A protein has these predicted regions:
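Extracytosolic ligand-binding ectodomains
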Residues: 4-392
């Protein structure tokens, strides 16, 4: 098995790469500008998404501090959270001789960046379609999530998975997952985004009313019997809400937040137990509000290295006295990746180094850059008694 290249992010790891080389070349590094690593930063630093952009920028500053190399210079520019703002700021970076840029965050901001020459953009988007040739989608994409779910599905031997998705902004993503059909879905459904309508739709999918009527019919029959075994059965049935089983063994829901909670709660109200049917969703970035919902128990989702995320969050909070946006961990890793490539190429950055076939390891886990996207090796976690438990 090929050994992963490890770009070192934490301070103690950075010095294990080649601390002697740093000391021996420190005077040489300061001698010429060619030894300086210039990194452009393209984030929304004003407007609606300013808080998000500032969180990403602080994560990069934290990585810069951990690397502790004065020959790395960052050049933050405001993308304004849109394509025009990103293009105009990228032109300025281009004029200043910047070759590598972290950002932008949003897929929409990439639209005009193919007009920029001689710059590679490490975008934090998780959308990996229609990526410009000079950009890399570094976010936690759906392909990486599906890949690890497929392996886990095979291991636990589930064969009848329902695909559920809302009629919303996730329509394209849901269609992509359905059409690719890596998970071999048993049936697919869409549901209304109105929480009041979701329950009725889930009842229909699970045949709740039919199972409820089956129970009522069986109870009426048993009530007419004086047999001991029928009386015992009646006692059990009176504690139940439906009779019979559903015709699926797992459910994969492409959704987030309150709407995801509504869907899973509707399954619970439809008498579909999460102890018997396994529920899955996409990466949720360890949303702790799930702990407060009984319906979210045993919910499974793919994600990054949780232990490293907790370490990052703690260090960020201690440094800046505020909580980070969890996704900002990727911008921290992006600077570590760029530094690793520069450091290990005689202090020169070449874009082709990012496509090393042996892959890399960051705080978010192992990954390989291929076809203008990062392919991550993710884990599977489940919600269990106010904890996120790694199961795969």
């Amino acid at each position: 098995m090929k050994k992963l290249l490890t770009f070192s992010i934490l301070t103690y790891l950075l010095f294990t790469i080649n601390s002697n080389a740093v000391n021996e070349n420190s005077s040489e590094n300061n001698a010429g500008n060619e030894k300086v690593l210039k990194v452009g930063i393209l984030l929304p630093l004003s407007g609606e998404f300013e808080v998000l952009g500032q969180s990403f920028l602080k994560a990069i500053q934290l990585a810069l501090y951990d690397i502790s190399n004065e020959n790395i210079k960052i050049y933050p520019k405001d993308s304004k959270g849109n394509a025009l703002g990103a293009y105009e700021s990228a032109k300025i970076l281009e004029e200043n001789g910047i070759k590598i840029v972290i950002g932008p965050i949003f897929h929409e901001s990439l639209k005009r960046l193919n007009e920029i020459n001689n710059i590679t953009f490490i975008s934090l988007t998780n959308k990996n379609k229609n990526i410009p040739k000079n950009a890399i989608a570094f976010g936690i994409n759906i392909d990486s999530q599906i890949a690890v779910l497929k392996k886990y599905f095979n291991e636990i031997e589930i064969t009848k998975t329902l695909l559920l998705s809302p009629n919303s902004e996730f329509t394209k993503q849901s269609k992509y997952v359905k059409d690719k059909d890596v998970l071999n879905f048993y049936r697919t459904y869409t549901y209304d985004t109105n929480p009041k309508k979701i329950t009725a739709e889930i009842e229909k999918i699970t045949k709740y009313r039919e199972r409820k009527k089956d129970l009522e019919r069986r109870i009426k029959i048993l009530e007419k019997s004086d047999l001991y075994k029928h009386k015992q059965e009646l006692k059990k049935l009176e504690q139940m809400h439906t009779l019979g089983t559903v015709n699926f063994d797992s459910v994969f829901v492409i959704d987030f937040g309150e709407r995801l909670k509504s869907v899973l709660t509707s399954f619970m109200f439809s008498d579909v137990s999460n102890a018997k049917v396994k529920f899955f969703t996409i990466n949720q970035w360890f949303d702790e509000t799930f702990f407060n919902e009984n319906a979210m128990q045993n919910l499974h989702f793919p994600s990054i290295d949780f232990n490293n995320l907790k370490k990052f969050n703690k260090k960020f909070s201690n440094t800046f006295n505020e909580k980070p946006n969890e996704v900002s961990l990727l911008s921290y890793d992006a600077l570590g990746l760029i530094y690793y490539c520069w450091f290990n190429n005689n202090f020169q950055f070449k874009t082709e180094q990012l496509y090393n076939k042996k892959g890399f390891r960051g705080l978010h886990g192992q990954f390989l850059i291929e076809n203008n996207q990062s392919k991550q090796k993710l884990n599977i976690y489940k919600v269990s008694e106010k904890k996120f438990i790694k199961v795969y």
